[in-house]
Curated annotation (Swiss-Prot):
Organism name: Phaeodactylum tricornutum (strain CCAP 1055/1)
Domain named Radical SAM core: residues: 58-276
UniProt-recorded name of the protein: Lipoyl synthase 2, mitochondrial
Family designation: Belongs to the radical SAM superfamily. Lipoyl synthase family.
Cited HAMAP family: Lipoyl_synth
Length: 314
């Protein structure tokens, strides 16, 4: 295990440090997001998973809202979210609260994610679908990304969400195939994750699919390249790479701090393979503001071009 973080690995303070780092207007945006979440009793993965980019994203007026409560039924060895085999039932008003909060923020792109809920028959797919539909009703031009579990491999649940009106279907494979048993809960596995991403694309081919991989867990370059090859084979459009950070001493240790140069190498490999977008860097996370900005403009551009083509051929 490395002794401390390298000098080039710096994380800005997300809360108290935010006011001095950003302008007063930006800090007010951070406070606005935090206040609206607290008032509506909503959770974000930004806080629960101790994301290092919380200051940047919240100051940009966006966050990743975590549906289905804040307690996960699984116990992955990299994750800081609370776990319990029998978490409280989901709040039936959560989809409505989420729509209210997001519309108030005035954003054009939102990410919805959740804990794993293996205790719910459909894994929470219908809850997600209802939230997406309410968001679209309140703001039709809003782009919605859903970062979801593997739904225990239940393809009916994948289909429910894929057809809900969302724009980006995201599910994280997390790590290379060899390391899956050591990193993820036993109920998750590499092939099951690939099958859910593949089915989402089969059900709705125009849907953007996305996944994320943590580096620094002991993977080899060949394994990372093979993972990208597997993802492209099932039509995944977007992949992100970020450095794994150990949340507590009870979680997996960091094997190495991957250099910025290596992250850039993986970005180039992914782009050469044909991914529509690759975000790769030590601080990149699956729900990352810079990536959302790029995806938003890419989706709008491609849809505008498609509409023009239809008009010309009419």
């Amino acid at each position: 295990m490395p002794k401390g973080r390298p000098s080039w690995f710096k994380v800005p303070a997300p809360s108290q440090g935010t006011q001095s780092t950003y302008s007063t207007a930006s800090y007010s945006r951070y406070a606005q997001v935090k206040d609206s979440l607290q008032k509506l009793d909503l959770h974000t993965v930004c806080e629960e998973a101790q994301c290092p980019n919380i200051g940047e994203c919240w100051n940009g007026g966006t966050g990743t809202i975590m549906l289905l409560g804040d307690t996960c039924t699984r116990g992955c060895m990299f994750c800081a979210v609370n776990t319990d085999s029998k978490p409280p039932p989901p709040d039936p008003f959560e989809p409505f609260k989420t729509a209210e909060a997001v519309v108030a923020w005035g954003v054009d792109y939102i990410v919805l994610t959740s804990v794993d809920r293996d205790d719910i028959a459909d894994g929470g797919a219908q809850h997600f679908a209802q939230t997406v539909q309410l968001l679209k009703q309140n703001k039709p031009n809003l782009l919605v990304e859903c970062l979801v579990s593997d739904f225990q491999g239940m393809l009916d649940s994948v289909e429910t969400l894929a057809l809900s009106g969302l724009d980006v279907y995201a599910h994280n494979v997390e790590t290379v195939e060899r390391l899956q048993p050591f990193v993820r809960d036993a109920r998750a596995n590499y092939q099951q994750s690939l099958s859910t991403l593949q089915h989402a694309k089969v059900v709705k081919p125009e849907l953007y699919t996305k996944t994320s991989i943590m580096l620094g867990l002991g993977e080899t370059e060949e394994e990372v390249t093979q993972t990208m090859t597997d993802l492209r084979a099932i039509g995944v459009d977007v992949v992100t790479f970020g450095q794994y950070l150990r949340p507590t001493e009870h979680h997996l240790s960091v094997v190495e701090y991957v250099t910025p140069e290596k992250f850039d190498h993986y970005r180039q490999v992914g782009e050469n393979m044909g991914f529509k977008y690759v975000a790769s860097g030590p601080m990149v996370r699956s729900s990352y503001k810079a990536g959302e900005f790029y995806l938003e403009h890419m989706i709008k551009k491609e849809r505008t071009e498609a509409a023009i083509d239809i008009g010309e051929n009419a």
